[in-house]
């Protein structure tokens, strides 16, 4: 029997590095004492009114343009209703059917030398939630004896980049995530530190029989805080689903939690549908209607993107593809290389020294 086809889509959440939160004047920063960067707006006190952060809106437009998305002339914020301890308002200000950015793609260079185009369904804006820390000897959620909630992160501007289900292997997923991370870092809209949570990635994965056009039952995986974790979690889930199907079991649509220490996923909850959140338009925030002039000003400010920079290093500097890839993988290496060359170092010598 032919192998089943793996179908993967990624939802990447990006914390923006604005000075203040999305809808209030509280400081946006990592590492402060718990519950110190809070106010009536981000804590959801009655009577407090949100005011959109213009810098954050400019950042999502910049991301959308870099991903070749269409910037919507009219988009709305919605209330996404659900109950959770780290949601002080019991709803999250997000976007539903009218996001800022629609369509688009990201081209990624695969290890075999081929190029994969991954479609971008949408890029939308929302506020982040607070952070819950579960206390247990093992550090596992299901064994927690208590939970602590820090609302410093509540209200931080968050951009969600949703890919099409175009990814066919864990290796492709890892390559896509690296390329997206490099793109976001080059735009200077986020520090994209997965270990600090400023870039978080959820994966939707299903298996389908060969020559089938319909997708299989989708499972969402959460809690992957590195590219390596993403690959490991997807490989485990492929093996788990394959064994289940071979044993005649039915795959359940659910959200699963990745346990890095155990190297396995475990069931967290049933997978929600959009209607479970009872979306409705946010009455306190007007529509986002960026002018064409503002969009073009942002487009003109875009830097050289990672893929174009790699091609230039190979074409004009004579660097090998693998060397160019290392130099462009993070902004610090890129800046160091560019500055070293500006000071007179030969291209190859500078690249060898840095890599």
Question: Model regions: which residues?
Answer:
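Histone-fold and other basic nucleic-acid-binding segments
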Residues: 318-355
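Short acidic alpha-helix initiation/capping motifs at coil-to-helix transition points
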Residues: 301-308, 314-318, 328-333
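Basic, nucleic-acid-interacting segments
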Residues: 1-304, 315, 321, 342-346
């Amino acid at each position: 029997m032919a192998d089943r086809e793996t179908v993967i889509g990624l939802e990447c959440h990006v914390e923006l590095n604005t000075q203040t939160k999305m809808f209030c004047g509280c400081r946006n920063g990592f590492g402060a004492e718990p519950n110190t960067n809070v106010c009536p707006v981000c804590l959801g006190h009655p009577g407090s009114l949100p005011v959109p952060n213009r810098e954050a809106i400019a950042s999502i437009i910049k991301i959308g343009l870099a991903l070749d998305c269409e910037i919507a002339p009219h988009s709305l914020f919605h209330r996404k209703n659900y109950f959770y301890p780290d949601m002080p308002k019991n709803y999250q200000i997000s976007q539903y059917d009218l996001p800022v950015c629609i369509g688009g793609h990201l081209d990624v260079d695969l290890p075999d030398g081929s190029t994969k185009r991954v479609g971008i369904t949408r890029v939308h804006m929302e506020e982040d939630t607070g952070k819950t820390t579960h206390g247990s000897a093992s550090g596992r959620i299901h064994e927690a004896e208590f939970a602590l909630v820090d609302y410093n992160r509540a209200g931080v501007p968050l951009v969600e980049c949703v890919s099409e289900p175009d990814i066919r292997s864990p290796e492709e997923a890892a390559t896509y995530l690296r390329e997206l991370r490099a793109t976001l870092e080059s735009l200077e809209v986020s520090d994209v530190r997965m270990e600090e949570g400023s870039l978080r990635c959820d994966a939707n994965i299903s298996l389908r029989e060969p020559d089938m056009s319909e997708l299989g039952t989708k499972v969402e995986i959460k809690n992957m805080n590195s590219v390596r974790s993403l690959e490991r979690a997807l490989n485990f889930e492929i093996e788990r689903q394959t064994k289940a199907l071979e044993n005649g079991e039915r795959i359940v649509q659910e959200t699963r939690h990745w346990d890095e220490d155990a190297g396995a996923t475990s069931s967290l909850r049933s997978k929600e549908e959009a209607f479970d959140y009872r979306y409705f338009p946010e009455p306190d925030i007007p529509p986002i209607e960026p002018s064409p002039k503002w969009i073009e000003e942002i487009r003109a400010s875009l830097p050289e993107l990672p893929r174009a920079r790699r091609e230039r290093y190979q074409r004009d500097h004579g660097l090998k593809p693998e060397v160019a890839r290392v130099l462009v993988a993070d902004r610090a290496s890129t800046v160091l290389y560019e500055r070293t060359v500006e000071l007179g170092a030969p291209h190859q010598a500078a690249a060898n020294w840095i890599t």
